[in-house]
Structures are given as structure tokens and as C-alpha cells.
């Protein structure tokens, strides 16, 4: 059994670690709430653009935008959104597993995959696998800016426009609630059609578009795709903070359990030490 002094040192060390994990839990909770607000604020904007795009596309029967046209798929592009930091449980690895399953499906169909990566964890993971990375963005921080994300998005948009990829997907962790974050892979290009129920056809959409619907459609499509990826980044950030909060709470609770166990061991060691001292005193007295 370890000595009492050694056990006291271990208890002090675990208590210091517990303070750190508790502080990280509180910080993650605060950041998660702020990110949730940002996520909720950007979602209506994205949804409205999507509806406008669908109405313009339905009204321009003679014009087929390439972003809305299905192709034979020979090569696909994936924008994968991961975190820059760790200590967030299995958040990243669950997403990576989901993407690798998709990549295997494409490989079985003899379709190659190209990647645009957001987040340093994804960069290191996919580069170690030797996959083809077209673009990467890291260090977005807790307040991601659209300007930092646009480059990676436009790289994939241009690749689709030039026929270098035939479909584009975005992969990220969707924030469901504090305890649940779900890996999601959604198609960006060609843009999936909205159902009539989602379009809200009962509303008044008899608009005159300037300069003309085709030019407006091209501009809106690019803006919509940028917004969708930004939404994915914010969603993933909220998931990261929630996962980190849960992980740090578990670490704090485990530290408390370990402290209790060490305290029990310390008490037993102290009791054994006192018993030995008493035995020595009694033995000495008997010898006299």
C-alpha cells in the first residue's frame, strides 16, 4: 500500500485537475448558449433564400441552371466540418466514420472523392489517410466569419461548375440537444428540390425580378451555398461545445469519485500507520 504522504499528493493532484475540468465545463456551457443563438439567427435567412430560389427556378421553365441539373456521377466533392480542438468526446471520430462509410460506397461504384476541409482535426485525419484534399480552413475560433469559409466553398462550387466534380456534399455534426449531436451528410449540389408543402405556394410570390431571374438565380445560389456551409460550421460548433461540456462534466464527476477512493485508501494507510506505532509502543513497554 502506498504511503500516506504519497496518497495526499495524488489527492491534491486530482483536485487540481478537477478544478480545471469544472472550469472548462462552465466555459463550454456559456459558449454553447451563445452559439445556439447564432445558429437560430442564421437559420431563417437560409430557409428564406432556399424558398426564393425554388420559386424562381419553377417560374423560369425555359432556363435550367447547372446547379439544379443532375449529372452522371464520376467524381464527388465533400466539405467536411470538424473541430480545431479536442476534448469533445467522440464527436469528430463519429463524423469521420460516417464519411469513410460514404467514401467506401463511392469507391465501390468507381467514383473518386475530393475533399474541402474545415477544422484542423479533419485536416490531420484525412491527410494521414492520403485522401485528395482540394482546400482547407483552420483556426475559425468560437466566432466563425463567413469570409474565412467562402474560399473553401467557392473552391467546390467552381469545381462543380467546371465539371471537375459531379456532386457536392457537406458533412458536419448537427446539434440536436445538449446530450445528442448527430453526424449529418447533406447534398449541396445539385441542389435538391423542395416539396410544394415547403414552398408555401399559398403565399403571394408574383414578384418582378431585376435585372432578370437568371442573373438573380445564379447570385442567390452561390449565396445560399455559402450560407448552408456557414450554418453547418455553426451547428458543428454548438455540437462541439455541448460535447465538451458533457465530457468535462464526466471528467469532473470521475475526479470526485477518484478523490473519494483515494481518501479511503489514505484513511486505511493512516490507520495502519497508527496501529503500527501503537504496536511498537506496546512492544517496547513489554520489553521494559
From Swiss-Prot:
Keywords, sorted A to Z: ATP synthesis, Cell inner membrane, Cell membrane, CF(1), Hydrogen ion transport, Ion transport, Membrane, Transport
Compartment list: Cell inner membrane
UniProt cross-references to InterPro entries, sorted A to Z: ATP_synth_F1_ATPase_gsu, ATP_synth_F1_gsu, ATP_synth_F1_gsu_CS
Main location: membrane
Lipid bilayer topology: Peripheral membrane protein
Subunit architecture: F-type ATPases have 2 components, CF(1) - the catalytic core - and CF(0) - the membrane proton channel. CF(1) has five subunits: alpha(3), beta(3), gamma(1), delta(1), epsilon(1). CF(0) has three main subunits: a, b and c.
Task performed by this protein: Produces ATP from ADP in the presence of a proton gradient across the membrane. The gamma chain is believed to be important in regulating ATPase activity and the flow of protons through the CF(0) complex.
HAMAP family documented for this protein: ATP_synth_gamma_bact (MF_00815)
Name of the protein in its database record: ATP synthase gamma chain
Amino acid at each position: 500500500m502506498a504511503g500516506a504522504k504519497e496518497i495526499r499528493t495524488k489527492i491534491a493532484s486530482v483536485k487540481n485537475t478537477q478544478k480545471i475540468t469544472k472550469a472548462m465545463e462552465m466555459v463550454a456551457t456559456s459558449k454553447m448558449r451563445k452559439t445556439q443563438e447564432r445558429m437560430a439567427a442564421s437559420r431563417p435567412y437560409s430557409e428564406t433564400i432556399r424558398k426564393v430560389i425554388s420559386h424562381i427556378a419553377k417560374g423560369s421553365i425555359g432556363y435550367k441552371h447547372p446547379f439544379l441539373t443532375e449529372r452522371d456521377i464520376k467524381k464527388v466533392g465533400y466539405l467536411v466540418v470538424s473541430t480545431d480542438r479536442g476534448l469533445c468526446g467522440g464527436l469528430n471520430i463519429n463524423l469521420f466514420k460516417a464519411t469513410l462509410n460514404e467514401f467506401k460506397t463511392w469507391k465501390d461504384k468507381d467514383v473518386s472523392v475530393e475533399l474541402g476541409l474545415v477544422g484542423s482535426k479533419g485536416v490531420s485525419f484525412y491527410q494521414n489517410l492520403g485522401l485528395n484534399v482540394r482546400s482547407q480552413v483552420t483556426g475559425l475560433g468560437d466566432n466563425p466569419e463567413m469570409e474565412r469559409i467562402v474560399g473553401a466553398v467557392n473552391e467546390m462550387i467552381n469545381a462543380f461548375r467546371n465539371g471537375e466534380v459531379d456532386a457536392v456534399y457537406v458533412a458536419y455534426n448537427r446539434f440536436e440537444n445538449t446530450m445528442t449531436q448527430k453526424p449529418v451528410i447533406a447534398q449541396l449540389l445539385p441542389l435538391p428540390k423542395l416539396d410544394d408543402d415547403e414552398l408555401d405556394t399559398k403565399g403571394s410570390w408574383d414578384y418582378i425580378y431585376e435585372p432578370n431571374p437568371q442573373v438573380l438565380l445564379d447570385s442567390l445560389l452561390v449565396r445560399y451555398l455559402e450560407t448552408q456551409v456557414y450554418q453547418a460550421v455553426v451547428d458543428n460548433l454548438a455540437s462541439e461545445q455541448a460535447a465538451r461540456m458533457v465530457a468535462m462534466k464526466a471528467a469532473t464527476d470521475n475526479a470526485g469519485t477518484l478523490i473519494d477512493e483515494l481518501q479511503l485508501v489514505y484513511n486505511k494507510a493512516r490507520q495502519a500507520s497508527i496501529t503500527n506505532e501503537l504496536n511498537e509502543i506496546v512492544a517496547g513497554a513489554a520489553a521494559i
